[in-house]
Amino acid sequence: METVQGYVILKAATFETGHGFALGHNPGAPSPFVTWQFTEGENGHRDYYWGRYGTSQAWAQRDFDCRVDDYQQLYHAAVKHTELG
């Protein structure tokens, strides 16, 4: 999977809109877990932003799930595909 700012992307969900969310891990970072929103371009390149950083994988998984659910409800968007690292 992709590495962003030293974080390996463990999981990602992309919506039909080209937006999505990712969960990353960097065991050497002070906050080893992150969730990001991203925008995926036509060539598949992703721009990551609005990171939320935490210290536990359980927290990161909950945050990832909440962000995906909130986006689905707010924009009535379907998940196009998910990836697991």
Stretches with model-predicted labels:
Residues 1-34, 77:
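Short N-terminal "domain-start" leader segments
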Residues 75-85:
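Intrinsically disordered, low-complexity charged/polar segments
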Residues 23-51, 67:
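Short aromatic-glycine-(Arg/Gly/Cys) micro-motifs in beta-strand/loop hairpins
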Residues 47, 59-62, 76-78:
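Glycine-rich loops and low-complexity Gly/Arg-rich segments
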Residues 55-72:
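A short, charged, amphipathic alpha-helix used as a generic interaction element across diverse proteins
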Residues 7, 48-49, 53, 71, ...:
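Sequence-level detector for tyrosine residue identity
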